[in-house]
Each structure stands twice: as structure tokens, then as C-alpha cells.
Amino acid sequence: MKENWVYRRGDIYLANLGVPIGSKQGGVRPVVVLQNDVGNFYSPTITVAPLTTKIQKKRNQPTHYFLRKAKGLARSSMVLAEQLDTCDKTCVIRYLGKVSKGQMRGIDEAVKVQLGYYIPEQAEEKRQGKCRKEVNFDGG
């Protein structure tokens, strides 16, 4: 990528994530930028989620978000929000495209689940008025 390239949240790039270890995604693959645009401007790294074309495996997993094949994305893919990664900008190969605002909202929901900011079961219980009593862990 050009030295003065400006990375944006929601951009999709082809990047080299290095050697895959175990179930961790690696190699050259598409990634979506999750980091805020201020960090994208100043930092030598970007926070990304890798994409996979193996979309049938665990398709309904709450940390996955499906992206249909579109301009810049040759095949339908799954965003793997459970595999958030910090990628040095020197590992970015080329720009592929950008997700829509609606798609970014869906990806954000998957990231919230991964980081524990949103737990689907608790949200459903709250919606149905079945909230559990809060537990005080300090013995009180």
C-alpha cells in the first residue's frame, strides 16, 4: 500500500496475517478494518477481523457475520469476530472494497458478543422479563 494511504473503518483489504497457528486464521486473506479512524490515521497498526470463505461451518455462530459476494469481494465470506487481530500496515497488500453501514452494524454486533459487551441469552431474558438476580461477589 502507498505510504500515505488512509485506512478507514469498514474497509476490506487483502492482508498477510502470517503463519496460521492451530485454529487461528493466517496467510493472505481479506480482512475488515474495525479500528476507529483516528487510530487508523496515527497508528502503524490496524485492528482487523479476518474473513473466510468457509461459510457453512458455524454459520449461525453469534461472533460470525455473513458478507455476500460483491464488488471487491470475489466470494461470499464470513467475518470472524472471534479472531480479532492487530495487523501492521506493512502487511496490507491491497484495497478490496468497503462494507455498507448496515453491514458494519452487523459486524459491530458480532464484535460486541466476542468482547462480552452483549450476550444474546441475557438480552433475550431481559426482553422477556426473566432477568436473573444480580450476584454480589464481595460476600455482601
Task: Please report, for each region that a protein language model flagged, where it lies by residue.
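Conserved functional hotspots at enzyme active or ligand-binding sites that engage polyanionic ligands
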Residues: 1-140
